[in-house]
A protein has these predicted regions:
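All-alpha prenyltransferase/terpene-synthase fold signal
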Residues: 1-428
Length: 428
């Protein structure tokens, strides 16, 4: 007799379909979420809908590898979830993509970055639109300052009721202010998506707590990044802490734990995933720092050397300085002192900084640290008991690809091919 298919069977089939293309499944849910939000924005005001809401939607759908959503999914699957929780996991993944939009749009404003994913950054796009309408020339960009990054939102509030003509607001200033609002809208939509999702009663509290913690950590990391620039922080330990908060936890660790919480993982399993995610997440940000200096702009979508021009105290920079000081290398220190924080730094001067990173051994030390962190990350998976070995292999491969490390086979299986994650191409 033919067995009657149950709801559990259908849920299993849905989960397996997502397994085959997690990014595609996240895209489909994002389409649904954004469609509803765009309708709400247009109903509030047509101009706002076109200028801000549609840009948020295009930015969110226009790039990235859906990294955070993939970690939610494989965290869920490794812990035995799927079926009834698949829909909730995909909505969480969509919400995380909107948080990423907020983070990248705001980051570009604070850094004065002109490009994102090989295209004009959102603030630059708005500036270009309104500069053309008003006939304004874009002023020469000066070095970004800590104070301006913090105060921009307040200045917009003070002048929002006045037109560009009466307030003297330039297209440059308007573009930055509009981008701040776009990032705010993306974060609001992310929160709405989480709040509107039906989670299992046993997981709801844990997922919401992880979500709240993640948002605070992300903002704290961005503040430390700004603070490090204005104070010229030289501490490798502080650089690591900034990297953990700004990117590592919300990119890898927290999404993994959200998936595990949805699946009802026990403390031991959640602890292993936390440690694995923390190591891979830090390696991810350190690899991003490496790409920011040595990456090919054609592949990363961002100009090479901008971290140097902005004076960011990355782990790479702080280690190079510490090694130069220990060796008494005044020449290397002179190159770093002259270059870091110079917004008009030439390509030749950037090359000299690259040479210092190599000659001091900072680049090699960073590459070794990335590989070590990747190895530690996947080592934490070795003791996990799972009913789905294929899911464990996928997670193993994703962790190593995210870390920018060389792939190798997980215990008990062949390596799974995962596209290498180019952080500077939109994942940060």
């Amino acid at each position: 007799m033919r067995r009657i298919r149950t709801a559990d069977d259908q849920g299993t089939d849905q989960a397996r379909a997502v397994d085959a293309d997690v990014a595609g499944a996240v895209e489909r849910v994002l389409d649904e979420v954004l469609g509803a939000r765009l309708a709400e924005a247009a109903a509030a005001d047509a101009l706002f809908g076109r200028d801000i809401a549609e840009r948020v939607a295009r930015f969110t759908l226009g790039g990235g590898k859906r990294l955070r959503g993939r970690f939610v999914w494989w965290g869920l699957r490794v812990c035995g979830g799927g079926g009834e929780t698949a829909g909730a996991a995909l909505r969480l993944a969509a919400a995380l993509e909107l948080v990423q939009t907020c983070a990248l749009v705001h980051d570009d404003v604070m850094d004065g970055a002109e490009l994102r994913r090989g295209r004009p950054a959102l603030h630059a796009e708005v500036r270009g639109q309104y500069a053309q309408q008003s006939g304004q020339e874009r002023p020469v960009r000066s070095a970004e300052t800590f104070g301006r990054s913090v105060e921009t939102a307040g200045r917009f509030t003070e002048t929002s009721g006045r037109s560009a003509e009466t307030s003297g607001r330039s297209a440059e200033s308007f573009g930055r202010s509009a981008a701040i609002l776009a990032g705010d809208l993306a974060l609001a939509w992310a929160d709405d998506t989480v709040m509107d999702t039906s989670f299992p009663a046993s997981a709801r509290s844990a997922v919401h707590a992880l979500w709240r913690t993640m948002r605070t950590e992300m903002v704290a990391g961005q503040y430390l990044d700004l603070h490090g620039q204005v104070t010229a922080c030289r501490s490798p330990a502080r650089a690591v802490r900034t990297a953990r908060l700004k990117s590592a936890r919300y990119s890898v660790e927290r999404p993994l734990l959200m998936g595990a919480a949805l699946a009802g993982a026990d403390d031991r399993t959640a602890g292993a995933l936390r440690s694995a995610g923390r190591c891979a997440g830090l390696a991810f940000q350190l690899h991003d720092d490496l790409l920011g200096v040595f990456g090919d702009p054609e592949k990363t979508g961002k100009p090479s050397g901008d971290d140097i021009r902005e004076g960011k105290p990355t782990y790479l920079t702080t280690v190079a300085r510490a090694r130069a000081e220990a060796a008494g290398d005044d020449g290397a220190l002179g190159v770093l002192d002259a270059a870091l924080g110079d917004p008009d730094l030439s390509a030749a001067a950037v090359d000299r900084v690259r040479d210092v990173f190599v000659s001091t051994g900072a680049r090699a030390a960073l590459e070794d640290k990335i590989e070590t962190l990747a190895d530690r990350s996947t080592a934490y998976l070795a003791g996990l008991r799972t009913a789905d070995p294929a899911a464990l292999r996928h997670l193993h491969a994703l962790l190593r690809a995210t870390a920018g490390a060389r792939p190798h086979a997980p215990p008990g299986g062949s390596p799974v091919t995962v596209p290498v994650v180019a952080a500077r191409a939109g994942e940060r």
